[in-house]
């Protein structure tokens, strides 16, 4: 068991180091984005919502086709991938990195590796469910996809995408400040109250 844990830790360290090397040119931008997403200042949440809202208003106004939208998005990614490693050191000054910044960059890369591992793990579990319990797999997939299709049909796709993107960008800050845990705790308490009231009525 200990050997397996050590092997997993060593593999995590190797993957993290590899990712750090790949994203070295993005280090300054990632640290800045990390501060924004974790709401280190009070005005960051409204700024996130404002930028996302402006972006989606532009998309709504231009009303591009799917092909044009995908092409522009990929083109933007290519430009960012080329320009960010060149411009970021000049803007932020990578030679001024502190030990704390380096440690935080390491933590971000480690969290990204862990997230990728979780996603791969869920993907593998899905396929193992398909092999072990095919009926449950197909029923679950059909019901889930039908629900998603129904929601997509009822709600405007651009609005739905806007809500999803906004929630995903606000999620790190919500977790950092314990807001999600707070409301989950409130929901659990309310559910427990309802269950207790139901038990009393049954008695």
Swiss-Prot record:
Topological region Lumenal: 63-65, 176-203
Alphabetical UniProt keywords: Apoptosis, Endoplasmic reticulum, Membrane, Transmembrane, Transmembrane helix
InterPro entries per the UniProt record, alphabetical: ER_autophagy_membrane_reg (IPR052114)
Cellular compartments per GO CC: cytoplasm; cytosol; endoplasmic reticulum; endoplasmic reticulum membrane; endoplasmic reticulum tubular network; membrane; Sec61 translocon complex
Cysteine pairings via disulfide bonds: none
Topology term for the membrane: Multi-pass membrane protein
Main location: membrane
Localisation per UniProt entry: Endomembrane system; Endoplasmic reticulum membrane; Endoplasmic reticulum
Keyword Membrane included in the entry's annotation: yes
A molecular function (GO) term: identical protein binding
Membrane topology (Cytoplasmic): 1-41, 87-133
GO process terms (BP): apoptotic process; cotranslational protein targeting to membrane; endoplasmic reticulum tubular network formation; endoplasmic reticulum tubular network membrane organization; negative regulation of apoptotic process; positive regulation of L-glutamate import across plasma membrane; regulation of endoplasmic reticulum tubular network organization
Tissue: Expressed in the cerebral cortex, cerebellum, hippocampus, olfactory bulbs, medulla oblongate and limbic system (at protein level). Ubiquitous. Expressed in all hematopoietic cell lineages, with highest levels in early myeloid progenitor cells.
Pfam families: RHD_RETREG1-3
Membrane-spanning ranges: 42-62, 66-86, 134-175
Free-text comment about domains: The transmembrane domains are required for its ability to shape the endoplasmic reticulum membrane into tubules.
Function recorded in the entry: Positively regulates SLC1A1/EAAC1-mediated glutamate transport by increasing its affinity for glutamate in a PKC activity-dependent manner. Promotes the catalytic efficiency of SLC1A1/EAAC1 probably by reducing its interaction with ARL6IP5, a negative regulator of SLC1A1/EAAC1-mediated glutamate transport. Plays a role in the formation and stabilization of endoplasmic reticulum tubules. Negatively regulates apoptosis, possibly by modulating the activity of caspase-9 (CASP9). Inhibits cleavage of CASP9-dependent substrates and downstream markers of apoptosis but not CASP9 itself.
Subunit-level organization: Homooligomer. Heterodimer with ARL6IP5. Interacts with ARL6. Interacts with TMEM33. Interacts with ATL1.
PANTHER family, per database record: ADP-RIBOSYLATION FACTOR-LIKE PROTEIN 6-INTERACTING PROTEIN 1, ADP-RIBOSYLATION-LIKE FACTOR 6-INTERACTING PROTEIN
Record's protein name: ADP-ribosylation factor-like protein 6-interacting protein 1
């Amino acid at each position: 068991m200990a050997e397996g844990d050590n092997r997993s830790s060593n593999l995590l360290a190797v993957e993290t180091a590899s990712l750090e090397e790949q994203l070295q040119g993005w280090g300054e931008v990632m640290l800045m984005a990390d501060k924004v997403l974790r709401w280190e200042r009070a005005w960051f949440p409204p700024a996130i919502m404002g930028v996302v809202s402006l972006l989606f208003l532009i998309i709504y106004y231009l009303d591009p086709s799917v092909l044009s939208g995908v092409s522009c998005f990929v083109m933007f990614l290519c430009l960012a991938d080329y320009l960010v490693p060149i411009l970021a050191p000049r803007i932020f000054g990578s030679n001024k990195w502190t030990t704390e910044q380096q440690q935080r960059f390491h933590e971000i890369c480690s969290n990204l590796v862990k997230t990728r591992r979780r996603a791969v793990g869920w993907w593998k579990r899905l396929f193992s469910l398909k092999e072990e319990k095919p009926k449950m797999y197909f029923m679950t997939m059909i019901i889930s996809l039908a629900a998603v299709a129904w929601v997509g049909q009822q709600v405007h796709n651009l609005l739905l995408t806007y809500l999803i993107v906004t929630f995903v960008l606000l999620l790190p800050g919500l977790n950092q400040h314990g807001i999600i845990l707070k409301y989950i705790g409130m929901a659990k308490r309310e559910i427990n109250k309802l269950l207790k009231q139901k038990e009393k009525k049954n008695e």
